[in-house]
């Protein structure tokens, strides 16, 4: 059974990446000072701008 992942059929929708950029906020506290770090990942490859699937997704070469 497959589930719909954006415009791409994937066996597990949790394995598919989201469109655009993703941001993670990491706050590290050591002794009396804190440091905030923002990590930005580049978007995954798209198929005609309609479909994104992560490398472990069953539909890595889906046709959208």
Curated annotation (Swiss-Prot):
User: Keywords assigned by UniProt?
Assistant: Metal-binding, Metal-thiolate cluster
- UniProt keyword Transcription present: no
Biological-process GO terms, alphabetical: cellular detoxification; intracellular copper ion homeostasis
Source organism, top-level taxon: Eukaryota
Q: Does the keyword Metal-binding apply?
A: yes
What InterPro entries does the annotation carry? MT3
Q: Which GO terms describe its molecular function?
A: copper ion binding; zinc ion binding
Role this protein plays: Metallothioneins have a high content of cysteine residues that bind various heavy metals.
What family does the database annotate?
Answer: Belongs to the metallothionein superfamily. Type 15 family.
What name is this protein filed under? Metallothionein-like protein 1
Organism of this sequence: Prunus avium
